[in-house]
Amino acid sequence: MKKRVFAMLMACVMALSLMACGSKSDSGDAGNNGGDSGVETIKLGGVGPLTGGYANYGLSVQHGAQLAVDEINAAGGVSGKQLELSFQDSQGDPESAVAAYGKLMDWGMNVFLGGVLSGETASVVTAAKADDVFIMETTGSADKCIDGNDKAFRVCFYDSYQGTAAADYLNDNQLATEVGVFYQSDNDYSAGLYNAFVAECAKTGVTIKET
């Protein structure tokens, strides 16, 4: 998990570097992107379940992101600027994620790392667009969780990609012609993978016997 989050945050850092370089030739308002030459710290914000049923997942992402921030800062930061991370608890609830996002904006967030869960990101993506905040989504994998925001980008696989890849692997390696599937229908991530898996199995001839 730490390696995955580190790689994701490094992608964010590269994007920030480009933004910082671009701001040098921009005499206008730098907005909330952390590119203002007067800003010594780039504030990164994240939202996720630090308590509740999904806390183990949220805490892993938070700790991995903080580790990456510490290592990047120790190496000199981004274009001479230090990174600062604030991670707010959503308890895994989309409505609580909106309140958590609001706290990050009050704090002065420059870049939003998205929600740990897809539903969290989907609940704030419109507000982030209105606030002109750059989003680098690191773990929310639902296909449409960042739709409608042209400043939102993603560095993780889509659910449909993962579900399709799983079905293709099953078929390509002739592992089974009939399968049963356990999934959580009220969980966006689980349901997204399931739907893509079932759709691809229908194309490859693998029969879903039980779900």
Question: Where are the predicted features?
Answer:
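An alpha-beta-alpha
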Residues: 152-211
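Flexible, small-residue-rich helix->loop connector segments that border functional cores
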Residues: 66-78, 170
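Short, low-complexity disordered leader/linker segments with a strong preference
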Residues: 1-43, 74, 106
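Structural recognition of the beta-strand scaffold that forms the well-ordered cores
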Residues: 43-47, 84-87, 110-115, 133-139, ...
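Beta-alpha junction/loop-to-helix N-cap segments that form part of ligand/metal-binding clefts
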Residues: 28-32, 36, 56-63, 75-146
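Short acidic, glycine/proline-rich loop/turn micro-motifs
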Residues: 147-151
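Extracytoplasmic "Venus flytrap"
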Residues: 38, 42-66, 88-94, 117, ...
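Alpha-helical elements of the RecA-like P-loop NTPase motor core of helicases
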Residues: 55, 95, 122, 164, ...
